[in-house]
């Protein structure tokens, strides 16, 4: 049985796509968005930064958004609601609630033990390890779909998950594989 008690995960970034279901006049929107940039010759949307919650939004005339930099799903919801309130002040009409779809969550974490990455790479299926190019094992989980970067220190980065539950499940699958191939050292009692 895999022991997850020492595993720590922290959200570093969430990316979401949002549909406001309304067309936007970006020339008007740029006037009400502080900390924003709009140069249609370079990019077809507004790049807007909120300080609270601390996120960046890409706003398109189709009413579609990309929100990035969030540390929680609640931050995304707060940012979208804040933008909607701002848009209402310039006459934007909303017929329905926005649709928010999480596209990617990135977690950093620590498994709480060290690993011989050469042994991991030789034993584990679905992984890549080229230490001359990158100092970690790249482990791909098929279901839930995620990619875990495993470093010799036991530190990990998990990306591609669409929920916190999926990230934990992906890490659980990695640990099961490590255990299955005898790559998890049992804690040995130190003798004094």
UniProtKB/Swiss-Prot annotation:
NCBIfam families recorded: PRK00394.1-2 (NF001593), PRK00394.1-3 (NF001594)
Family, similarity comment: Belongs to the TBP family.
Protein encoded by which gene: tbp
Lineage, top ranks: Archaea, Methanobacteriati, Methanobacteriota, Thermococci, Thermococcales
Repeat region (Sequence), residues: 11-87, 102-178
Protein name according to UniProt: TATA-box-binding protein
Keywords attached to this entry: DNA-binding, Repeat, Transcription, Transcription regulation
GO process terms (BP): DNA-templated transcription initiation
Species of provenance: Thermococcus onnurineus (strain NA1)
InterPro entries for the chain: TBP (IPR000814), TBP_archaea (IPR033711), TBP_CS (IPR030491), TBP_dom_sf (IPR012295)
Keyword flag DNA-binding: yes
Known function: General factor that plays a role in the activation of archaeal genes transcribed by RNA polymerase. Binds specifically to the TATA box promoter element which lies close to the position of transcription initiation.
